[in-house]
Amino acid sequence: SKKIGLFYGTZTGKTESVAEIIDEFGDEVVTLDID
């Protein structure tokens, strides 16, 4: 199975992947486990 990150919209309207969030907030991240 593959791990894909959830996406969130920023104030500027840009979308960043959860992988970038991990660098800032550590393990406070949710991922979807895709089989």
Swiss-Prot record:
Domain of life, source organism: Bacteria
GO molecular function term, any single one: FMN binding
Domain Flavodoxin-like: 4-35
Swiss-Prot/TrEMBL keywords: Electron transport, Flavoprotein, FMN, Transport
PROSITE patterns per the UniProt record, alphabetical: FLAVODOXIN (PS00201), FLAVODOXIN_LIKE (PS50902)
Cofactor: FMN
Biological role: Low-potential electron donor to a number of redox enzymes.
Entry similarity comment: Belongs to the flavodoxin family.
Listed name of the protein: Flavodoxin
Protein's organism: Nostoc sp. (strain MAC)
